[in-house]
From Swiss-Prot:
Part of the 50S ribosomal subunit. Belongs to the universal ribosomal protein uL13 family. InterPro entries: Ribosomal_uL13, Ribosomal_uL13_bac-type, Ribosomal_uL13_CS, Ribosomal_uL13_sf. PROSITE patterns: RIBOSOMAL_L13. This is Large ribosomal subunit protein uL13. Keywords: Ribonucleoprotein, Ribosomal protein. One of its GO terms (cellular component) is cytosolic large ribosomal subunit. The keyword Nucleus does not apply. It comes from the Bacteria. One of its GO terms (molecular function) is structural constituent of ribosome. CDD domains: Ribosomal_L13. This protein is one of the early assembly proteins of the 50S ribosomal subunit, although it is not seen to bind rRNA by itself. It is important during the early stages of 50S assembly. PANTHER family: LARGE RIBOSOMAL SUBUNIT PROTEIN UL13M (PTHR11545:SF2), RIBOSOMAL PROTEIN L13 (PTHR11545).
Length: 142
């Protein structure tokens, strides 16, 4: 019996919508990363993008445990001397709740060209509405 290697024509992409309200951030990101990567499918191959497309709604209502709202920091650097900026999770959820989930999922995907392609299939919205009704997404309970 030969080892099965999927071809691009063998890959079927389904659309799923995930409601992030009252979900723990890390557990939600882990489930979304598995679906984006395609590890839940039989035809998974680590060198190919076999994953599904995921729509996350209500990103502003995501929860964390403990005191992470004040203790967790997001860092970025401008490239200039003394240009290190830090933002707390509470501020990020107030200003850009989509980026909180995107950064959490990004850390769970491969750090290469394939991981960047997988991240493009993730659509995140702070509210309930999303413009992807034409794709007829199925609801995914995580």
């Amino acid at each position: 019996m030969k080892t099965f290697s999927p071809k691009p024509t063998d890959i079927t992409r389904n659309w799923f919508v995930v409601d992030a309200s009252d979900k723990i951030l890390g557990r939600l990101a882990s489930a979304v990363a598995v679906r984006l990567r395609g590890k839940h499918k039989v035809e998974f191959a680590p060198h190919m993008d076999t994953g599904d497309c995921i729509i996350v709604v209500n990103a502003a209502k995501v929860l964390t445990t403990g005191r992470k709202l004040d203790q967790k920091k997001y860092y970025r650097h401008s490239g200039w001397i003394g240009g290190l900026k830090e933002t707390s999770l509470r501020d990020m959820l107030a200003k850009k709740p989509e980026d909180v989930i995107r950064k959490a999922v990004r850390g769970m995907l491969p750090k290469n060209r394939l991981g960047r392609a997988m991240l493009k299939k993730l659509k995140i919205y702070a509210g309930e509405a999303h413009p992807h009704e034409a794709q007829k997404p199925e609801t995914l309970d995580v």
